[in-house]
């Protein structure tokens, strides 16, 4: 099981998602899968990022609600969540 680390940006992003009426249970479900190193179902379109986000991964909680994270040996860092326009 990986140690969970949340960045300040991620925590702020979650508050914004709640204000937007997003179903946070969807985010929690993905986090639970990632923490136990379980592969995400294909519908989440999990993939590596390039450019400024090299070394990180992104998955789609919903078509325009993304999660950016980084997996280390013993931890997983949740860096950002939001829409494409919020993050890129």
Please state what every model-predicted region is.
Residues 1-58, 63, 71-77, 85-88:
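Basic, Lys/Arg-enriched alpha-helical interface segments
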